[in-house]
Amino acid sequence: MTLLSSHLLVFSAVHHRAPPTTTTRNSPTTNHTVRFLCSPGVPPAVRLDQRLPRFVVPGAGAEDLLYNAGATVGVLGGGYALVRAFDELTRRNILQQGLSRKLVHILSGLLFLVSWPIFSNSPKARYFAAFVPLVNCLRLLVNGLSLASDEGLIKSVTREGDPLELLRGPLYYVLILILSALVFWRESPIGVISLAMMCAGDGIADIIGRRYGSMKIPYNEHKSLAGSMSMLVFGFLVSIGMLYYYSVLGHVQLDWASTLPRVAFISFVATLVESLPITKVVDDNISVPLATMAVAFFTFHH
């Protein structure tokens, strides 16, 4: 047999392999994603898109490492610029400190969520993304423990200007960002919805509640009906918007007919949890995203 005929036989064998067997249950694929298949007769709310994402970036080797490192630096720079911009607006009395702090709360997490598709398709990309809030976590620890003093950071993310505040709500906030990136990443709607409810839902609830919150919730005098309603509405809308964003980029495929009511239910539960008089025991930056994750996991996997 000649060398040419040997190559032709090998080529023929490769292109006539038997097709892979059909996945019959939730199982990991070779590209480290999971197919969400539903029980017979039950329409799926979400399927991972097995097509090549429309946003194609490097996936392996030194090029992938450099690409993700560059993306990390870019996202870090964007987050730093955001905080500094609001600090400057506050310093010039263009924005009140309380409003500036809440806008940072809303925008920093959402911009981090929007940045995920910038990273490569490598399974290791999530670790590069998680490095961004990890750096902010270290900044909060250093300043919260008074090992250093960044007045701009303290004014931008604390209520009273006390560095110890950095070790509570803001620290919990960045820890949830890290958790969502590492555990859920782009393969699941759970992390997307959780961050949308924590950042947009809870953040807008505070802004609206302080301005129009004269009518309080009967079981919690510190929370208002206007704030809770705004959290429900904006949390739902931002969650749907983010899911649509990831759907357009090809990371997930959604059955919108079943996804919309499920996200509405998740938003309702998250709003209910946020309205409970438990803030002194559990911070909203912990209770809201963790409750959202639990309900979303149950909703999208059943």
Curated annotation (Swiss-Prot):
Write out the coiled-coil annotation as residue ranges.
none
Q: Name one GO molecular function term.
A: phytol kinase activity
Q: Biological process (GO) annotations?
A: vitamin E biosynthetic process
Describe the family membership recorded for this protein in Swiss-Prot or TrEMBL: Belongs to the polyprenol kinase family.
Q: What is its EC number?
A: 2.7.1.182
Name used for this protein in its record: Probable phytol kinase 1, chloroplastic
The regions listed as transmembrane in this protein's record are 65-83, 103-123, 128-148, 164-184, 189-209, 232-252, 263-283
Which PANTHER family is this protein grouped with?
Answer: DOLICHOL KINASE, PHYTOL KINASE 1, CHLOROPLASTIC
What is the transit peptide's residue range?
1-57
The record describes its membrane topology as: Multi-pass membrane protein
Keyword Nucleus assigned: no
Localization, per the record, is: Plastid, Chloroplast membrane
Keyword annotations from UniProtKB, A to Z = Chloroplast, Kinase, Membrane, Plastid, Transferase, Transit peptide, Transmembrane, Transmembrane helix
Q: Which organism is it from?
A: Glycine max
Q: What does this protein do?
A: Involved in the activation and reutilization of phytol from chlorophyll degradation in plant metabolism, including tocopherol biosynthesis. Catalyzes the conversion of phytol to phytol monophosphate (PMP).
